[in-house]
Regions:
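A short pre-motif secondary-structure segment
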Residues: 103-107
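Arg/Lys-rich amphipathic alpha helix in sigma70-family domain 2
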Residues: 31-35, 45-65, 82, 134
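C-terminal flanking helix
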Residues: 2, 23, 97, 101, ...
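Sigma70-family region 2
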Residues: 7-10, 21-38, 57-59
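Structural recognition of an alpha-helix C-terminal capping motif at a helix-to-coil junction
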Residues: 3, 17-24, 37-49
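Short, charged helix-capping/linker segments at alpha-helix termini
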Residues: 2-21, 125, 148-150
Length: 160
């Protein structure tokens, strides 16, 4: 569950704080688990909600509310992704603006719908879609830049 919290945090310490807050909530709500679905899924949802609440409380989370039409963004080259270490991908995700990163995590990784994300974050469904589209676009540009300049390959060679 630390990995779940870390996707929303800016540092390991912040992720640990989120996780600790989440486990406190889990223990407080343990008697409400109804055995309808997996226990792990229930815990994961509490950790995600705790992380979002933590972000709102401590980082004054702000989202762009500008609504744009979603447009097709071609997928990044699989060669660029394959040549990168997990650490580099995690760093690219952490370098995204907080709003983009949060929506990307909730939609692409946690599997929430844009409607659910809008409700969770207090934004319009269309804003969630826009944030997700922008996050994908920014990640694609950064992946292409890494591939173009060979940064991933150079870093890979220096780790061998």
């Amino acid at each position: 569950m630390l990995g779940v919290a870390f996707r929303y945090a800016n540092s390991r310490e912040e992720a640990e704080d989120m996780l600790q807050e989440g486990f406190i909530r889990i223990f407080q709500k343990l008697n409400t688990f109804r055995f309808q679905g997996s226990f792990e899924g229930w815990i994961r949802r509490i950790i995600v909600n705790t992380a979002i609440n933590h972000i709102r409380k401590y980082q004054n989370l702000k989202y762009e509310c500008e609504i744009e039409e979603a447009y097709y963004i071609p997928a990044a080259s699989s060669d660029a992704i394959a040549s990168m270490y997990t650490r580099e991908v995690i760093q690219l995700l952490h370098d995204l603006p907080l709003g983009y990163r949060t929506v990307l995590n909730l939609y692409a990784i946690e599997g929430y719908s844009h409607r659910e994300i809008g409700e969770m974050l207090g934004i319009e469904e269309s804003s969630s879609r826009s944030q997700y589209t922008r996050a994908k676009s920014l990640l694609q540009k950064r992946l292409q830049k890494l591939e173009e300049y060979g940064i991933a390959e150079n870093d890979k060679a220096s780790h061998q």
